[in-house]
Every structure is written in structure tokens, then in C-alpha cells.
């Protein structure tokens, strides 16, 4: 590895946000997961958790969507919500799920000085009630259009 490559990797690692993570619950399409990985890498999130209670663990991500981001991230896969949340509780102060409710806070009002896990649901049903009940609260991504939801790959 060249000295320039080592220097670039060191710079990137120094800017990683180890106090912010993303959790994806039952996301069916591996290309959507890969798109989230690419975004996470771009904004400096190091760790992603993939929780699958309805489908088996993903063996392969959509390579074109992630642009190989998966190899630079720590990706944890879970099949049990309890195990996933036990790990999240050990490492993060606050766990919030995306869910449109009267109690949901705006993404812009979240105190990101705390360590936070943001949970996103699947393409069809969003975050399950079971996972919402395990979390500390809900948040929304404010929108001004008619459609009140975003695809997981862009949220």
C-alpha cells in the first residue's frame, strides 16, 4: 500500500462518527441496503446493523449500489431483535425509529451530541411495532411534498 493511500485511509478513519449508527430492519432488497451503506460511508458512519427477522441473512450486497462501501464499514447482521437491541443499548445513548406519529420528533431536533442509533424499516411496512416498542422514541424526516415517505435507499 502506498504512503498516500495509508494517509487517505487514516484521514477518513479520523473523521468517522463512531457515536452514530444506522439499523435496517427487514429490508428485502440488498441493493437498498447497499445504497444505505454508500451513504453511511459518505457521511462518516462506521457501523451498520442489519436486522432480519422475516428473511435470512443477506449473503451479498448489491455491489454496484454500494461501490464497495461494505468493505469499509462494520456491518453487523442479527436475526434476533433482543440481541440487536442489547448491543445497541451497550453502545448508544438513544435509539430512535422512523415512524410517522404524533410523538415523533423532527430529524432536525435530535440532539446529535449524544450517541444515537437510527432505525429504518423495510420497503413495505416501515419499522415494525415490536421494534418501535423497544426503541426510545420515533423521529421523522420532514418533507414538504404530498408523499409522506421516502424509499429506504434515500432516507
Segments (PLM) and residue ranges:
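Post-transcriptional modification and biogenesis factors for structured RNAs
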Residues: 1-154
Amino acid at each position: 500500500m502506498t504512503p498516500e493511500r495509508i494517509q487517505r485511509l487514516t484521514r477518513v478513519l479520523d473523521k468517522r462518527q463512531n457515536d452514530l449508527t444506522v439499523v435496517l430492519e427487514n429490508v428485502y432488497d440488498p441493493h437498498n441496503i447497499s445504497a444505505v451503506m454508500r451513504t453511511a460511508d459518505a457521511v462518516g458512519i462506521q457501523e451498520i446493523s442489519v436486522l432480519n427477522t422475516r428473511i435470512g441473512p443477506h449473503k451479498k450486497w448489491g455491489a454496484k449500489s454500494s461501490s464497495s462501501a461494505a468493505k469499509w464499514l462494520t456491518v453487523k447482521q442479527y436475526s434476533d431483535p433482543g440481541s440487536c437491541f442489547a448491543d445497541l443499548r451497550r453502545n448508544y445513548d438513544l435509539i430512535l425509529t422512523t415512524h410517522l406519529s404524533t410523538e415523533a420528533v423532527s430529524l432536525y431536533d435530535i440532539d446529535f451530541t449524544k450517541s444515537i442509533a437510527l432505525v429504518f424499516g423495510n420497503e413495505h411496512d416501515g419499522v415494525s411495532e415490536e421494534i418501535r416498542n423497544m426503541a426510545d422514541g420515533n423521529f421523522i424526516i420532514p418533507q414538504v411534498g404530498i408523499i409522506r415517505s421516502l424509499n429506504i435507499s434515500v432516507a
